[in-house]
Amino acid sequence: MPRLFLAFLLLLTARVSADKLEPRILFLGDSITYGGNWTVYVESAIRAQKGLSRATIVNMGLSSETTSGLSEPGHAGGSFPRPDLHERLGRVLAQFKPTLVVACYGINDGIYQPLDAVRQLAFQDGIIRLRLACIRSGAQVILVTPPLYAPDNRSKDVINYDGVMEAYGAWLVAQRSAGWQVIDIHPHLHQAVDAAKKADPAFVYAKDNLHPGEQGHLFMAQAVWQSLAPMMKWKADVSFAEGAKLKLLRDSSIVLRDAWLMQAGHKRPGVKGGLPLAQAEARSDDFIAEYLKK
């Protein structure tokens, strides 16, 4: 059977399966996703949809992670190599059983080096493996292009690592012609940061050039949501949660994230352990119940 036809059948099966099951939405990514701010904004928009207010939504991002399996020499002071998503992905999919996976990788996959064909191919292979594993598990998968690198200090990005991320993102976008669902956040983020700096020259997207601040996470969420909503046929014109409501969702997200990372297991040292899964789910249910009252 031709590989393209097989991929089409797998994708069709995943979408039919997802339509029949209760929504179980999984976010995967590196430290920017682990931080959880952009995912919580998106979660609030998902919970505003009819029938999704109590959907199971879990962020299992993991700091330092790649899809490529690459790690630069001396990473983390030589204490450990970057974790490889594929070491844990099978367990995550088997245990959580997502109907939808939203994955954002790339920023670590280039290991902060100039654009290189070998590293780029490793990223592409890792993404292909990620996508196929999700589809084979019965999940719909939506891939998000990498975010920005050093937009506040472009003159210091001497190897043009943001350009590496643009190249990685361009490859992802090109896969739309093969039926992939891809959200391209890179152009939106540049526009949003440029507009913010024009309004306030002191605005900073990422103090360390990598991890966005709160406003940067909001920009990411906006960029994701404007494409995710039509892809999923959700109502796009909804407001993200704010204030006390947003905090309740963050508390719920953190307790589930920590429990699920511990439950599924990983090889990244220094990650805070969580509650036993049943206890975490009960606490999350309490947070969501309070969230829905406000």
What kind of region is each of these model predictions?
Residues I135-Q140, W180:
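A short helix->loop->beta-strand "cap" motif at the edges of active sites that frequently abuts
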Residues P151-H186:
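Substrate-gating cap/lid alpha-helix
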